[in-house]
Amino acid sequence: MGSQLALKSRIASTASLEKIFNAQEMIASSHIAKARDVALNAKPYTDAIFDAVQALVAHTHIDHPIVKKDEDNPRVAVLALTSDRGMAGPYTSSIIRETESLLARLDAAGKQPELYVYGRRGVTYYKYRNRDVAGTWEGDTDQPGVGVAESISKALMDAYMKPADQGGVSELYIVFTEFVNMVVQKVRVLRMLPVELVLPEQQGSGPVSESDADAATPLYAFEPNVDEVLDAILPKYIQSRIHECLLTAAASETASRQNAMHTATDNARSLIDDLTRKLNASRQASITQELTEIIGSADALNKKEE
């Protein structure tokens, strides 16, 4: 009897969890279409800004922080985009794993990485381990707004534009999850600064030489001058890239949460079925034992009467 009570209790608690998982899956399902569309709609603007930066870099060949890497400055900024909430499968753990791998590679190369973290789960992870974090942001990782992108880009731009002797960094990296589709989300490492010129037909093959740069984009006239245009466009470039990464990361988080909750719901239902079979088997065994005892008692009484 005690075994049956324990099974009933487990079935009830698992059924309660199954309802929670199913509700979370439905909520994520209702958000994913909007999150995906927002991420896709932000891409054309980001691409246009990047094309403008490419044009500036390709046709000026000037000495500007946007393209010049300070080889004497070992400090590097790394931004990790995690989530505020859990129940999203391996979403945050995958980001942290890739971030740790990047930090290790930078350390091995003689760099001094400075970590920036967006998302409560990542902030808690590094705070619990007493790791130094240069900047943190929390809130609305599944629906990031322009405000948080502005805040992050300002902090990173301030760090990038500072002189080396004042604690400035020479490179900016961002670790995020790119939304591919509902099933596939890829963790990526993007170097935002300095900018590397890439020709359209050479996407993914790395930077190109200055001799090929003039073929990358059409000719432009820059007013009032190239330096002022670069100074004006650089903050917009960083903010737009970060905002796009935040949006695609939000879509990835929502998709990951939906997939995780769908799997959890299926597992809960499977466990309920398994526990129900065990409960039925226990009941059947209990009934069989009671019948056996009754029949045995009746036989004993009959023999006694004889």
Ranges and model annotations:
Residues 1-306:
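C-terminal beta-strand-loop-alpha-helix "lid" module of Rossmann-like NAD(P)-dependent dehydrogenases
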